[in-house]
A protein has these predicted regions:
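C-terminal nucleotide
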Residues: 1-45, 53, 66-100, 195-263
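A short glycine/serine-rich beta->alpha loop
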Residues: 31-32, 51-54, 92-100, 129-137, ...
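Acidic, glycine-rich active-site loops and adjacent beta-strand->loop/helix elements
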Residues: 41-42, 73, 83-86, 128-134, ...
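DPxDG-like acidic metal-binding loop motif
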Residues: 60, 137-157
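Helix-rich "cap/lid" substructures immediately adjacent to catalytic or cofactor-binding pockets
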Residues: 98-132
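Phosphate-handling active-site elements
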Residues: 116-125, 151-167
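Alpha/beta catalytic cores of group-transfer enzymes, especially the acyltransferase/condensing modules
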Residues: 158-206
């Protein structure tokens, strides 16, 4: 809770962070320049509502994506994953126009989208790891945000929270090919410890609602079904279209202005 994706972690407070740093030391025989962390999120209410510009809420949890990293001034990105066998390696100046089809598409997309607005000259070497099984907690958004935060730090780029959210969303929409809304990115960037995020995805106004002192203690249970999935290649985009069609029909039958379906 409470950690910002843009903040360098000075002390390695969890086993996952420590494992990431140890692997970096073993690989590169040096200390990392920093560790970028982005939490996973849970969504009590709002799934499939954000891409229809509705109101959602969410919580960040104290598990997520860690990247132990150091600068590479030759412009190379070289990232090993503790969760996937293949190492990502590419030049920041030569990102393919189309996705390749592996987990590193999230990194390539982050460079491509960020480079449209800012000069990216410094790459990075590092180790990335994700606590908990992949899928269901917005790990893809967390990978993009934690990587983008590290890349920004090394290239002296400062992003506001809203800009980071929108850029990370563009990576998923325009490069990876997932027609997601902004629920995942907003929860992972805006949430704070002991607060519930309430967000209107139409106008981006939000409120962080603190836990009431009179509220009884609670715990959040997350169950793993044994199945791992990726939104890419799933029927997520079709579900988004179905929600859009349903909302359009409801507006029409209720007598409201419904305009053109494409809008």
């Amino acid at each position: 809770y409470g950690k910002r994706a843009m903040v360098k972690v000075e002390k390695f407070g969890t086993m996952n962070e420590l494992e990431c740093v140890i692997k970096f030391n073993q690989t590169y025989r040096r200390e990392p320049d920093g560790v970028s962390f982005c939490p996973y999120r849970i969504c009590p209410l709002g799934a499939h509502i954000d891409h229809q510009y509705g109101k959602i809420n969410g919580l960040a949890i104290n598990y997520g994506i860690n990247i132990a990293y150091a600068a590479k001034h030759n412009g190379v990105v070289e990232l090993s994953s503790l969760n996937f066998p293949k190492r990502a390696q590419f030049y920041v100046s030569a990102v393919p126009e189309e996705k390749v089809g592996d987990w590193a598409d999230h990194l390539r997309g982050a460079v491509k989208i960020l480079a449209e607005l800012y000069p990216i000259r410094v790459g990075l070497c590092g180790v990335i790891e994700g606590s908990l099984p992949i899928g269901g907690l917005s790990s893809s958004a967390a990978v993009i945000i934690s990587f983008m935060a590290a890349l920004c730090r090394l290239n002296n780029i400062t992003l506001q929270e809203t800009e980071l959210i929108l850029l990370a969303k563009r990576v998923e929409n325009e490069y990876v090919g997932v027609s997601c809304g902004k629920l995942d990115q907003s929860c992972e960037v805006l949430c704070r410890k002991d607060h519930l995020l309430y967000l209107d995805t139409k106008d981006d106004t939000y409120e962080l609602i603190p836990t009431s002192p009179s509220m009884k203690p609670y715990k959040i249970a997350i169950f793993f079904s044994g199945l791992e999935r990726s939104l890419v290649g799933s029927k997520y985009n079709m579900r988004q279209d179905e929600c859009k069609a349903a909302a359009y029909a409801l507006q029409a039958f209720s007598g409201q202005e419904y305009g053109k379906f494409a809008d």
